[in-house]
Amino acid sequence: MTKLKFLALAIALLCGATQLSAKDYQVSDFGAKADGITLNTGAIQRAIDAVNERGGGRLVFGPGKYLTGSIYLKSNVTLHLERGAVLLGSTNPFDYVKDPYVRWMAMVFAMKQENIGITGKGTIDGQGFKTANNMVQYIQRGIYEDPLKLDRPNETNRPENIYFRECTNVTI
């Protein structure tokens, strides 16, 4: 019985130590601007990479609008949107990367990652209607192909908000 109690105590301490080691990082410390105008894709991705390399934690978005294109969430990183924070999708379709593995575009990608999440009281606004209208204009001007002649982007050319694939331990 004492071995069982010791094992339970050791597990509890390890779980507590893992929680204590999780740290908060402010996305603004990596150069992200909450003005709704500045394209923050690079700053947000650098922040995600840094948090991942440091063992994980929460990447905190304070109040404001953070304009972004495609970002890749990595293991042990949680995007935390405080009340009043908006992760705002760019309306420029060229700000999104078509992932070569899945051939889709998304604002937030995660592929084969673990212990990831998006939490908080903030908002994710992909601005899908505006983005779709911009894509239709690009089709009409011959910039985007429309092989089916539907005068709209096909499914692989429209960015999704969130695309997680083969991920474990996901919190939304």
Place the predicted regions along the sequence by residue.
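Bacterial N-terminal signal peptides that target proteins for export
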Residues: 1-8
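Bacterial N-terminal signal peptides
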Residues: 8-16
